[in-house]
Amino acid sequence: MELDTIVLTEDLPSHGLKAGDLGTVVLVHGEGAGYEVEFVTLGGETVAVVTLSAAQVRPISHDEMPHARATVP
């Protein structure tokens, strides 16, 4: 669903993203077949907006602990 927070399930080195990074769904394609997802720093700077398949994301679980890491320039 749009504006849901998701977890990336695989590394995307070309975008500077790692499995476990959190993103926000900004657009849903084909009833959940794919998603446009925005990944931002804690300061609000956009790192990437990427099109992902349903297999590349998963919903967050309320018993998970978020983790912070520095972005790679």
Enumerate the predicted regions with their spans.
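Basic/aromatic-rich interaction segments and small domains that mediate binding to polyanionic partners
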Residues: E2-D63
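Long, low-complexity intrinsically disordered regions
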Residues: H62-P73
